[in-house]
Amino acid sequence: MSEKYIVAIDQGTTSTRAIVFDHSGSIVSTGQLEHEQIFPRAGWVEHDPMEIWRNTREVIGQALSKADITRHDVEAVGITNQRETAVVWDRTTGKPVYNAIVWQDTRTQKIVDRLAADGGVERFKPTVGLPLATYFSGTKIVWILENVDGAREKAEAGELMFGTTDTWVLWNLTGGTDGGVHVTDVTNASRTLFMDLETLQWDDEILKAFDVPRSMLPEIKSSSEVYGQVESSSLLREVPIAGILGDQQAATFGQAAFDQGESKNTYGTGNFLIFNTGTDIIHSQNGLLTTLGYKLGDQEPHYALEGSIAVTGSLVQWMRDNLGLVSSAAEIETLAATVEDNGGVYFVPAFSGLFAPYWRSDARGALVGLTRYVNKGHIARAALEATAFQTREVLDAVNADSGVDLTELKVDGGMIANNLLMQFQADILGVPVVRPVVAETTALGAAYAAGLAVGFWKDLDDLRQNWQEDSRWTPDMDDAERERQLRLWKKAVTKTFDWVDDDVQ
């Protein structure tokens, strides 16, 4: 019998990838295309959904061709995606009525304020686990309905569909206007502000408060079941699509953090630390989000606490693209290594406000502690250290909420190739940092969810055996120095507050 594979589609913030995995969870081939980041105004971030769909089809072809396989060798397709990013499209034409509004976008602050006027930002938190914030999909849908000509009328008439990018890709992959499946999974639904964490269904009272017609919304399903088959014009025609997980939940799943008390931290455009709370819903007292971890078929859902950090890897991109301090993201480590320390400089990248644990939409970025002594090496180092400091603050919140101190941190994502950052991360946390052999845990998690649904993998134990340690960094900083640096970081964070006014965005 010839070997069989799983294809994972990873629709991310900066690119779309298709990755072919074998039974051991190893990567066989990858196809990848970046898409345009559209910034129409300060604080606005958009993607073109049609470009994302074109890229999805193309990267599938790239991956199959590189692996020298056809659809007959593929058992199932899994999808993982940038969460919260909202697409609204016409049910009849299949065309978006507006660009996708990206999770980092802050244009909906006035909508947040309006909804929070009655009950504060935690108005819906007991039901959905999330504060009112520009980050989540719900307010983005409202913005489109209120600002795109004819959108409200079409939505009321049942002519518009909403989805995060998993739903957009799934709908198109399964036929689009010709029988496309309009579904999302529990993890993505838990990021809209609309899903009841206990019933795992859309909450009609909340939809009424937002004035969003229920007819726009996809059906909520588990993270691991057959949703439909790929349509007939695709290179993957008739292959079942059998797994969907939001990117951070997918990375947790790919790290085999299946049990209560296990966690991972992903270093990507932003950083996302997820702590598995098992079948318990824990409402954070420390600025974390309560979210879905995963749900396999008809089994009980697993929940999680999440610390979301808006800007980490994208700070390095900004230094490359906007300042020209480095010509590639990888160069940041070399530049940072030209100095012994940060020279007293702290960089708080509150470009989209601050997410966990502060949730300050009025914050903006600040570079503090500058003197004539400081050079670009210090600034590069401060930019890397910002990622580690923000992670430490989120980990402190997780420890406080869970009552369990984490003993080591599993890491994944693009920035974990940066050894200087990983060592500083271990130093500032005071616990070891562990990198797995397969760093593409996001795509792997989606592959696992799909493979479980079709019997490609038997059970979670089967998946646990695939996880292997690649590298480990142990702390090498004394307690006094760690406390000094944390004190200065927290002082720097306070300097970013209260910047946004009516005439300052």
Swiss-Prot record:
User: Which residues bind glycerol per the record?
Assistant: 83-84, 135, 247-248
E.C. number: 2.7.1.30
Instruction: Tell whether Metal-binding is among the UniProt keywords.
Output: no
- Keyword annotations for this protein? ATP-binding, Glycerol metabolism, Kinase, Nucleotide-binding, Transferase
One GO cellular component term noted in the UniProt record for this chain? cytosol
Which top EC class applies here?
A: transferase
Q: A Pfam family name for this chain? A: FGGY_N
Q: One GO biological process from the UniProt record? A: glycerol metabolic process
Pathway involvement of the protein, from the record: Polyol metabolism; glycerol degradation via glycerol kinase pathway; sn-glycerol 3-phosphate from glycerol: step 1/1
Keyword ATP-binding present in the record's keywords: the answer is yes
Q: Where does ADP bind?
A: 13, 17, 269, 313, 414, 418
Q: What does this protein do?
A: Key enzyme in the regulation of glycerol uptake and metabolism. Catalyzes the phosphorylation of glycerol to yield sn-glycerol 3-phosphate.
Task: State the protein's name.
Answer: Glycerol kinase
What is the organism of origin for this protein?
A: Clavibacter michiganensis subsp. michiganensis (strain NCPPB 382)
